[in-house]
A protein has these predicted regions:
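Glycine-rich phosphate/diphosphate-binding loop of Rossmann-like nucleotide-binding domains
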Residues: 37, 42-62, 120, 128-202
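N-terminal ligand-binding/catalytic initiation module
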Residues: 1-118
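Acidic, His- and aromatic-enriched active-site or binding-groove loops in soluble protein domains
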Residues: 123
């Protein structure tokens, strides 16, 4: 009884969904299972335990409600469209365990088209923790961030996000040496995508 009142108000002013519903405290934890932990592409359903675990962390440490959504699709455009179509239900989107380089494309496009926060945990969560560790290590060793050289062993989503945050924190671009499974990423090396090439050194 009475539910029609907020329905009518939200239809006139969609922002009122934050006042009259759980939207503002509800996050979608979304994966296609293409990069599950260190296990690789095991499919969307296999990612469900990780997504449910993330939902538990949201509730336990931030009292944020969340729903895990596993998308059985590896096409970035299809994933983007799916998330766009359900985004109105949520106050935020947490992308999880989506392989690079698709994860970069998906996150960037969603940030452009949605009016809610979009966060790719594998990139930014890892980068925040790693940069905090770097800052503390530099403080203990009495070194300046602008003088240190850093080797990043790996060139996936997490590694690239870490390197980007290192640069934003003051590490010089030329002082970051990134390696993938084929070795150091350097200028002139063949068969590297646009995302890796941003870290190519002389």
């Amino acid at each position: 009884p009475g539910v029609a009142a907020p329905v009518k108000e939200i239809s006139k002013n969609p922002e009122l969904a934050y006042d009259y519903t759980s939207k503002g405290n509800l996050v979608a934890v979304i994966s296609n299972g293409s990069a599950i932990l260190g296990l690789g592409n095991l499919g969307s359903l296999a990612s469900k335990p990780v997504m449910e675990g993330k939902s538990v962390l949201f509730k336990r440490f931030a009292d944020i409600d969340s729903i895990d959504i596993e998308i059985d699709n590896n096409d970035p455009n299809s994933i983007i469209e799916t998330i766009k179509n359900i985004s109105g239900t949520f106050g935020g989107i947490n992308l999880e365990d989506i392989a690079a380089p698709d994860c970069f494309v998906i996150e960037q496009k969603l940030k452009e088209v949605l009016d809610i926060p979009v966060f790719h945990d594998d990139q930014h969560g890892t980068a925040i923790i790693t940069t905090a560790a770097l800052i503390n290590a530099l403080d203990i060793s009495k070194k300046k961030i602008s003088n240190v050289k850093i080797v990043v062993n790996g060139a996936g989503a997490s590694a690239q996000a870490c390197a980007n945050l290192f640069k934003s924190s003051g590490v010089k671009n030329e002082n970051i040496i990134m390696c993938d499974s084929k070795g150091v990423i350097y200028k002139g090396r063949k068969n590297i995508d646009q995302f890796k090439s941003a870290f190519a050194i002389d």
